[in-house]
Structure formats: C-alpha cells, structure tokens
Curated annotation (Swiss-Prot):
This enzyme's EC code(s): 2.7.7.56
Protein known as: Ribonuclease PH
InterPro entries linked to this entry: ExoRNase_PH_dom1, ExoRNase_PH_dom2, ExoRNase_PH_dom2_sf, PNPase/RNase_PH_dom_sf, Ribosomal_Su5_D2-typ_SF, RNase_PH, RNase_PH_bac-type, RNase_PH_CS
One record GO biological process: tRNA processing
Gene3D superfamilies listed in its UniProt record: GHMP Kinase, N-terminal domain
EC class of the enzyme, as a word: transferase
Organism: Francisella tularensis subsp. tularensis (strain SCHU S4 / Schu 4)
Residues reported in the UniProt entry to bind phosphate: 86, 124-126
Tree of life domain: Bacteria
Taxonomy of the source species: Bacteria, Pseudomonadati, Pseudomonadota, Gammaproteobacteria, Thiotrichales
HAMAP family, per the entry: RNase_PH
C-alpha cells in the first residue's frame, strides 16, 4: 500500500494554471498533488556569444526552490554564494529536455529563458518543472506570433514535452512518487518523453538495491502510461 493510498499506476491530482504571472511571455503554475512549481518562459532579444550570427536562437533554463518549499527551511543559494550540484544538474536536465522540443532556427536570434521556481516540494519537482516549462514555452511562442516577433505561420514547436518519476517502492513499481515514497524508494527513475511518443531522457538510480531488466521495463511502461495521461490532461 502506498502512503497516499493511490494505485501503483495512479498519478497525483494534476492541475495547470496558465498566465499565472503578469509579465512573462509564458507562465504556468503546475501542481502534481502537493508539489507546486511556477514555470515562466521569457523572450529576450539576442543570443549567447557562441550563437552569434548563427541565425539560430537559444533556450536555457534555471531552477530554484523557495526556502520554505521543503519541510524545514533551507537557505537561499544566492545567500550561500553558489548553486548546489543538484541544482546545476536539474537545470541542465530541464534545458536539454526543452531544447529537444524547439526548432531554434525558427525563433531567430532570440533567447527563451525558462525559470522554474518550486514553491512547495513533495517529490517530483524536476519532472513537474519540465512539464510546466513546456506549457509555458508554448504560450511564449504564441505571444511571439501575436506580437510580430515571429511569422504567424512559423512553427518552432517540434513537440510538447512531459516528464514523470517512477520507482520501486516496497518491492513494487510505482508511478509519480511523492516525497514519502521517493525518500524510501529502492529505485528512483525520471523519464522525459515528447508528444510524438519519443523518449528524450531517462535517469535511473538504484538506492542501495539493484533493479532487474524486468523491473526497468515495468517502470518504463508505467512512465509511458503516466506521460500519456499528462498529455491528454493538460496539453
């Protein structure tokens, strides 16, 4: 039995609020159960130096957690003077996943800057960030079209992207782990897929106990099922 009482293949309640903030070209509040993340997509003229005169745009992502998004308060990373290795890893994951969904040549020499800010954490913050950010990017691209920054016929969005966690909890494969499950899981895995059914990234780690190829296949099957439900619900 899962602590939440959910079935092993059951997602948490999923809710998306578009235009959650006033100023960003695209903004979304995404909620997976008690995990809540604000995802914004800002359009900035110009590109980094390594993209200058390439005719291509760029997309980059930042990730952070509010001090009391967790059970006990943590210091802001800005106050500590550096980002943790975890934060840097998650930012790179989000950026990689989202760049796989956008035709950078189609946005010209503009940069889409994604910010994912966790306001409440109960497991699955990186996967919620990817899903919410994909929605925010779609809104930002629509803003660019409506405001003459892109031709209305342009189609920079190659696909949508969603992500979910799966794992082995109490010797059983489960979908969409909350904090209680994640902190006690024998295996934790994050799966990122696009709306065409393609796999973008898989991160899987055994926590003190290995997992079999059969268990891996079951977890991947759960992830595919969950991501299909996410696309059907919020995209």
């Amino acid at each position: 039995m899962r602590p939440s009482g959910r079935n092993n293949d059951q997602l948490r309640n999923l809710k998306v609020t578009h235009n959650f903030t006033k100023h960003a070209e695209g903004s979304v509040l995404i909620e997976f159960g008690d995990t809540k993340v604000i995802c914004t997509a800002s359009v900035v003229a110009g590109v980094p130096k390594f993209k200058k005169d390439s005719g291509e745009g760029w997309l980059t992502a930042e990730y952070g957690m509010l001090p009391r998004s967790t059970h006990t308060r943590m210091d802001r990373e800005a106050a500590r003077g550096k980002q943790s290795g975890r934060t840097q890893e998650i930012q790179r994951l989000i950026g990689r996943a989202l760049r796989a969904s956008v035709d950078l040549t189609a946005i010209g020499e503009n940069t889409i800057k994604v910010d994912c800010d966790v306001i409440q954490a109960d497991g699955g913050t990186r996967t919620a960030s990817i899903t919410g950010a994909s929605l925010a990017i779609a809104d930002a691209i629509e803003y660019m079209k409506q405001n003459g920054m892109l031709d209305e016929q342009a189609n920079p969005l190659l696909s949508q992207v969603a992500a979910i966690s799966v794992g082995i909890y109490n010797n059983e494969p489960v979908l969409d782990l909350d904090y209680d499950e994640d902190s006690n899981a024998e295996t934790d895995m994050n799966v990122v897929m696009n709306s065409n059914g393609g796999i973008i990234e898989i991160q899987g780690t055994a926590e003190g106990k290995d997992f079999s190829e059969e268990e891996f296949a079951k977890m991947l099957g759960l992830a595919k099922k969950g991501i299909k439900e996410i696309f059907a619900t919020v995209f």
